[in-house]
Curated annotation (Swiss-Prot):
<keyword id="KW-0832">Ubl conjugation</keyword>
<dbReference type="GO" id="GO:0030291">
    <property type="term" value="F:protein serine/threonine kinase inhibitor activity"/>
</dbReference>
<keyword id="KW-1262">Eukaryotic host gene expression shutoff by virus</keyword>
<dbReference type="GO" id="GO:0003723">
    <property type="term" value="F:RNA binding"/>
</dbReference>
<keyword id="KW-1048">Host nucleus</keyword>
<feature type="short sequence motif" description="Nuclear localization signal">
    <location>
        <begin position="34"/>
        <end position="38"/>
    </location>
</feature>
<dbReference type="GO" id="GO:0039580">
    <property type="term" value="P:symbiont-mediated suppression of host PKR/eIFalpha signaling"/>
</dbReference>
<feature type="region of interest" description="CPSF4-binding">
    <location>
        <begin position="180"/>
        <end position="215"/>
    </location>
</feature>
<keyword id="KW-1114">Inhibition of host interferon signaling pathway by virus</keyword>
<feature type="region of interest" description="RNA-binding and homodimerization">
    <location>
        <begin position="1"/>
        <end position="73"/>
    </location>
</feature>
<dbReference type="GO" id="GO:0039524">
    <property type="term" value="P:symbiont-mediated suppression of host mRNA processing"/>
</dbReference>
<feature type="region of interest" description="Disordered">
    <location>
        <begin position="205"/>
        <end position="230"/>
    </location>
</feature>
<dbReference type="GO" id="GO:0039502">
    <property type="term" value="P:symbiont-mediated suppression of host type I interferon-mediated signaling pathway"/>
</dbReference>
<keyword id="KW-0922">Interferon antiviral system evasion</keyword>
<keyword id="KW-1103">Inhibition of host pre-mRNA processing by virus</keyword>
<dbReference type="Pfam" id="PF00600">
    <property type="entry name" value="Flu_NS1"/>
</dbReference>
<feature type="region of interest" description="PABPN1-binding">
    <location>
        <begin position="223"/>
        <end position="230"/>
    </location>
</feature>
Length: 230
């Protein structure tokens, strides 16, 4: 196993522990708590994949971070912060919408890259809106936290989420996943639109009414249902 992979996991575990202690003091805002929950799932998945114990990794990560801090000067810290572009966290969904339980009568699932797409293909003739929580950098989507499809009644009928065991995805990965989700939902004559926030940062080629316009390859796929569950 690559040593950088192990040390990266160890540092991530310790930094999550620090953030959790911060949240336990009721100091974190909604986006902070949202990321904390998502990162916890990601760390559990990575730990399982790597065969590493999270508690042991957290202790090792603490030693690594302490060593770095001992060697870090205030001036170097200022230069590092100034050189890193700041990302913004955008929320379409409330905490209730993020944590809302849902089940599928006709479950379908597809994995594309490091993203998992799930939907209920029993849903028919509904008006559906896609909402997402994600970070933005340079006016483009940086990291998808969670995307969900809601009916007008507020029911969750679809979802795109990062796979904990496969961290990392691009803006194009997210766009492709959105296309697959919309294609599956439209199969049963549902009307699907994308939130204004998603249109602006993740789906730039959209019509004014919020219904996305697909590239030719994606349009051909629209006539097919989503692939069988994996």
């Amino acid at each position: 196993m690559d040593s950088n992979t192990v040390s990266s996991f160890q540092v991530d575990c310790f930094l999550w522990h620090v953030r959790k202690r911060f949240a336990d003091q009721e100091l974190g805002d909604a986006p902070f708590l949202d990321r904390l929950r998502r990162d916890q799932k990601s760390l559990k998945g990575r730990g399982s994949t790597l065969g590493l114990n999270i508690e042991t990794a957290t202790r090792a990560g603490k030693q690594i971070v302490e060593q770095i801090l001992e060697e870090e000067s205030d001036e170097a810290l200022k230069m590092t912060i100034a050189s890193v572009p700041a990302s913004r966290y955008l929320t379409d969904m409330t905490l209730d919408e993020i944590s809302r339980d849902w089940f599928m009568l006709m479950p379908k699932q597809k994995v594309t890259g490091s993203l998992c797409i799930r939907m209920d293909q029993a849903i028919m003739d509904k008006n559906i809106i896609l909402k997402a929580n994600f970070s933005v950098i340079f006016e483009r989507l940086e990291t998808l936290i969670l995307l969900r499809a809601f009916t007008e009644e507020g029911a969750v009928v679809g979802e795109i989420s990062p796979l904990p065991s496969l961290p990392g995805h691009t803006n194009e990965d997210v766009k492709n996943a959105i296309g697959v989700l919309i294609g599956g939902l439209k199969w049963n004559d549902n009307t699907v639109r994308v939130s204004e926030t998603l249109q602006r940062f993740a789906w730039r080629s959209s019509h004014e009414n919020g219904r996305p316009s697909f590239p030719p390859k994606q349009k051909r796929k629209m006539a097919r249902t989503i692939e069988p569950e994996v």
